[in-house]
Amino acid sequence: DGQTKEICEKISELSNNSCIDILPINEVSNIDAYEKVVIGASIRYGNYRKEVFQFINKNIKKLELKENAFFSVNVVARKKEKNSPETNPYVIKFLDKIDWVPKKIGVFAGKIDYPSYKFFDKYAIKFIMWITNGPTDTSKTFEFTDWKKVEEFTKDLNL
């Protein structure tokens, strides 16, 4: 839905640093030129994209030598009891699957944009929302991102 990119753009805007590159992870060929690396990844049908894991595994040694951070964007984080790195099931599972330990970790609630989804996606997400007591009106868009939390995360990054 583009919410991860929107969060990246907000981080860039809040940092007041004109030397920030926002790139899709599969377009990053080399991280040598960067002092800091922040990886943002969203959940789609219960999983992060495989490119996220491939990128981290390929660059783990370099990532460990740099200031680094990871943030997750998922709709489960709309719930107060699942909106921290310690309580979000996707972040917990992610950290169990990789050898990298990010120096800073954030988790942000994403967005559901029912009108933009194709038929199957719309009703699959509606069903998931129904069983988790989320919004099910398919004529609307629901943004759950706590922008104040994004701002606090950005301050912690010292970009």
State where each predicted segment sits.
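N-terminal beta1-alpha1 ligand-phosphate binding loop
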Residues: 1-17
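Redox-cofactor binding/interface segments in oxidoreductases and associated redox assembly factors
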Residues: 39
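FMN-binding flavodoxin-like domain, especially the glycine-rich phosphate-binding loop
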Residues: 12-23, 33-36, 44-159
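Short, polar loop motifs at secondary-structure junctions
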Residues: 26-27
